[in-house]
Amino acid sequence: MGHAHAPRRGSLGYSPRVRARSQKPKMRNWAELGDQPKIQGFVGFKAGMSHIVMVDDRPHSATEGMEISVPVTIVEAPQMHVAGIRVYDDSPYGKKVIGEAWISDLKMLESLTHLPKNGYKTDEQLAKIAELVKKGVVADLRVMTVTLTSEVSGIPKKVPELMENRIAGGDMAKRFEFAKSLMGKAVGIKDVFAPGELVDVSAITKGYGTQGPVVRWGIATQKRKHARTGKKRHVGNLGPWNPHRIRWQVPQLGQTGYHQRTEYNKRILKMGDKAEEITPAGGFLHYGLIRNDYIMLKGSIPGPVKRMVRIRPAVRPKNMPKQAPEITYLSTQSKMG
C-alpha cells in the first residue's frame, strides 16, 4: 500500500517571521584576518542588476577557460567617514563598552543626533583607550563610521547612516594605532576589498506585508471535496483537541518579507569609480545614475533597489580563485524594455 510523503512546508529556522527593527542590517559575526589591521565592513546601496560575459576561471569546472554568462548586482558604495573609536570588554553577559573617543568636528551628524555643546575631549578619551589597550582588557575594537546618504542621488534619504565596523588583523595595539590613523578621514571601498575577493552581504528583504499561509509557508491548497467548503487557501488542520492551544509550528498567516538575510560567499567581479562603464542606457530602473564608487557582485543579493546593504569579508570562504576575473562583455543595454 502506498504511503503519502508530505514533509512540513516552510522552514522553522527563520521563526519568528517578524519585521526587522531597522533597515540597517546587524553584523553578529566577523572573520579573523592576518597580521595587518584592516576595516572589515562597508556600506552600499543596491542599484540594480545586469549581466556580463566572463572567462570561467574555476578550476576543474566543466566550462573552465570558456566564456560564460553571469548575472551580476551593482552596488553603489560612497565613502565612509571615520568619526570615532569604540572598545569592548568580554563580560559574562556579552560584550560591554568600556571606552570610546569621537572626533571634535561632528557637523555631519547634526541631523542624526544631539551633539554636546562643549564638544568631545578627543585626546583625553584616546589616552584612556590607550591605557586600556596597554592593560590588555580590550577584547574588541571597532570604528564608528558615517555614510553620507546625501551624496547618493539614487535614494531619497538625507539623514546620514552611523554604524560600527570591526578592526581585525594583528594585535590590539596595532589595531588601535590603525584606528587612530583613520580618525576624521574618509575610507573608500577600494581600501577595504579587492576584485576577486569573497564577501558576505546582509540586507533587509523586500516586504510584502501580511500574507496567507500559502504564500508565507508554501502549503498546498485544499483539493477536491475539501475545497467545496469555499476555503482553499488555508491549513487543513490547526492541531489536536488537547492541548487547548495552537502550536507555533502550525503555518498561519502573518508578516511576509522585510526580514534580515545574509548571503554568503558573493564574489567581487569588478570595482571602480567610472560609473559610465556599468550604467545601462537611461540609468538603473527606479534608481538612476551612480555618482560614487561601485562594486559588482556575482549573482543576486537580498533586498529591493535602493536598499542599504552591508558587506563584510566571508566568514567561511569557499575555495575560489582570488584574482580578478577576465570580463569580455558587460551589458549596458536599457532595462526599460
From Swiss-Prot:
GO cellular component terms, semicolon-separated: cytosolic large ribosomal subunit
Keywords: Ribonucleoprotein, Ribosomal protein, RNA-binding, rRNA-binding
Top-rank taxon, per record: Archaea
Any one GO molecular-function label of the UniProt entry: rRNA binding
Classification via SUPFAM superfamilies: Translation proteins (SSF50447)
NCBIfam families linked to this entry: L3_arch, PRK04231.1
Family: Belongs to the universal ribosomal protein uL3 family.
PANTHER family assigned to the protein according to its UniProt record, in alphabetical order: 60S RIBOSOMAL PROTEIN L3-RELATED, LARGE RIBOSOMAL SUBUNIT PROTEIN UL3
Its job: One of the primary rRNA binding proteins, it binds directly near the 3'-end of the 23S rRNA, where it nucleates assembly of the 50S subunit.
This protein's name: Large ribosomal subunit protein uL3
Lineage, uppermost ranks: Archaea, Methanobacteriati, Methanobacteriota, Stenosarchaea group, Methanomicrobia
